[in-house]
Amino acid sequence: NSKFKHHVISTGNWRGMVMRTDLEPFKDARVRKAVRMAVDRQALADLVTGGAASVTCDHPVMKTDQYRADLSCPQDIEGAKKLLADAGYPDGIEFTVYPSSLEPTWTPIAEVVQQQVAAAGIKVNIQVVPSDGYWNDIWLKKPVAMTRWNQRPADQALNEIYHSSAKWNESLYKNSAFDSLLDMARKELDFEKRKSMYQAAQKVLWDESGTLIPYTVSKLIVTTARVNNLDEVENWSVRWHKVTVN
């Protein structure tokens, strides 16, 4: 309908699957990466969101953030098989993930992941659990759970989710060198140096993270065709002084 405009605005909100890095077989970073490498993120995003998403490579930094690293993460079944074999699992691995209706996309994500990673010898069992008590009984408790986060600035997201001292470090990821990188970035006054540190931290997560973050969600906004200059960056409120109406 020519009377309306359809705006697709990228956000930093994401849904994913988290593996506890303190438990076998996920203590080995190669196993964690194998699971994540075996996922076709674009296909997953298209199936679950109808394309209203932007692919991300397991780094919790929104597409429009000045510190976001430019990473590539195509599905690599053979690479995943090799990592599993190198880690001592030539016949693959098996685990159970626990989605809930608390988040409507969790079960579809789990089902798509289940189908995609099977080719790498990774068997995923799905046990849907009640939404009541999910955060107390499943999250931070089960070896593999579903998770969701709303957007945060790069510094907050990286520190709040992955620093070993963080209360909400849901994958229980611990890496002293990674912690030091984040600590130094917070102290660095030079923008380019600070940016380099945050991007290096995101590359570490691609290699070692226990969290599959396949995509960030896009916000869909419909306005009359007369509206122009609506922010392309998601904000908690519209900057009305920039908007024009013909």
Predicted regions and their residues:
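Alpha-helical secondary-structure segments
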Residues: 1-2, 11-56, 81-83, 93-106, ...
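Ligand-binding "clamshell"
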Residues: 1-8, 140-144, 155-169, 224-228
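Structural recognition of the beta-strand scaffold that forms the well-ordered cores
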Residues: 6-8, 15-18, 37, 59, ...
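Small-molecule pocket liners
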Residues: 13-18, 58, 158, 169, ...
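Extracytoplasmic/peripheral linker and loop segments enriched in polar/acidic and small residues
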Residues: 29-33, 119-134, 159-225, 246
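Structural transition elements
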Residues: 54-86, 103-106
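Periplasmic binding protein-like
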Residues: 97, 109, 114-163, 197
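Long beta-strand-rich cores associated with HINT superfamily self-processing modules
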Residues: 221-246
